């Protein structure tokens, strides 16, 4: 099993297959525009710029499940990310990451890489690093800075 069997809708409402990312290392992150950790967007964009030419992708999944910190429409989210952080990596439409309506890729990621207490996502900016075969490799809590993920990206890109 891998992420390649799943699809998502991008922020513009277009269907995207994870299969289109085959052979790339992917970081999947649930995001929010009005969170104390929103500054992670800056570090995520830096990671993307540093590694995009090496077969690395980031997909941000806006989510309003934690403190209702992503209340905006798709256009508002896109505008916020562009104006404040110059985000050039992919964003999805707003999704849920926990509960019965959790996006299928999040159901899969959580079943493969559990958190400290259980499989649920605890907060915004939880990160999942997926290897170039589409297999979940490592889960990072919200408090892990994007910069601190670099050694793991290097390891996976080196293993390609």
Pin down the residues of each PLM region:
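Chalcogenol-based redox active-site neighborhoods
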Residues: 1-160
């Amino acid at each position: 099993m891998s992420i390649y069997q799943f699809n998502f809708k991008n922020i513009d409402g277009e269907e995207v297959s994870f299969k289109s990312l085959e052979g790339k290392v992917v970081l999947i992150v649930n995001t929010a525009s009005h969170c104390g950790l929103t500054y992670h967007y800056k570090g995520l964009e830096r990671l993307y710029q540093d590694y995009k030419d090496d077969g690395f992708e980031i997909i941000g999944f806006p989510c309003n499940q934690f403190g209702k910190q992503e209340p905006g429409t798709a256009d508002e989210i896109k505008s916020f990310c562009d104006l404040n952080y110059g985000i050039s990596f992919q964003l999805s439409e707003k999704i849920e990451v926990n509960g019965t309506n959790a996006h299928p890729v999040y159901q899969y990621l959580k079943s493969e890489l559990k958190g400290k207490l259980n499989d649920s996502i605890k907060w915004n900016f939880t990160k999942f690093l997926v290897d170039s075969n589409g297999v979940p490799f490592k889960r990072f809590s919200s408090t892990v800075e994007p910069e601190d993920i670099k050694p793991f990206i290097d390891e996976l890109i080196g293993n390609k």
